[in-house]
Amino acid sequence: MGLIKQLFTNCACPQGRMGRAMLKFMNLCHAPLTNWGLKLVNIQDGWTMLDIGCGGGATLQRLLKRSKDAQVYGIDISEESVAKAKKVNEEVLDKQVFDTQGSAEKQPYEDGKFDLVTAVETVYFWPNLPNCLQEVRRVLKSGGKFAIMVEVVDGDSMWTNVVEGMTAYSPEELKTMLDDAGFTQTEIHRMKPSNATIIGIKG
């Protein structure tokens, strides 16, 4: 397996040396998309927020900076990711930032806990996406928001041919799945042809 292939195979569940390199790459390269997407959400002070597929923990930092007195939770299936996210946020770990290893499909949180759930460049790898969306809806408060941020659209074989286990969805497909999961006021926002944020609200 070539070096590039090895690196991008670590997108779904970073492991080992290549996984750590991928987490650094994600923290840096996801910044423009994440910062733009979070501006669309109108985050309020004191919110309780969750980032699913938290990777290297940079989105947890960005959420915390946008909400005074917030509590920010991260969950990721990768042990390497959780370790990196904890290190990046160690000054506020277990005070304002709480990170755990786990799956998008079976989250260890009570019903109606979060004001906002985010998913940055991660839904491509979620197993049984409709079930995962129902789980997101379960942990959101009534009126809570779910923001999906993606840089890849359906049919982008440049990535899906390189990254094992990746499924690219169009923004329209994701919006339809949010509608089917019971989210309301779903909207698609575009920054570039291949950059989108899809937002839904738990009614």
What are these regions (language model features)?
Residues 28-47, 62:
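Conserved alpha-helix/loop element of class I SAM-dependent methyltransferases that forms part
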Residues 50-106:
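Class I SAM-dependent methyltransferase SAM/SAH-binding core
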Residues 105-116:
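A short acidic, Gly/Pro-enriched loop at the edge of an enzyme's catalytic core
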Residues 116-129:
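A short SAM/SAH-binding and catalytic strip from SAM-dependent methyltransferases
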Residues 130-142:
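A short glycine-rich, Lys/Arg-flanked "PGG" loop and its adjoining helix->strand segment in the class I
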Residues 144-150:
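Conserved beta-strand signature within the Rossmann-like core of class I S-adenosyl-L-methionine
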Residues 166-181:
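Short alpha-helix
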Residues 182-184, 190-203:
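Core SAM-dependent methyltransferase catalytic element
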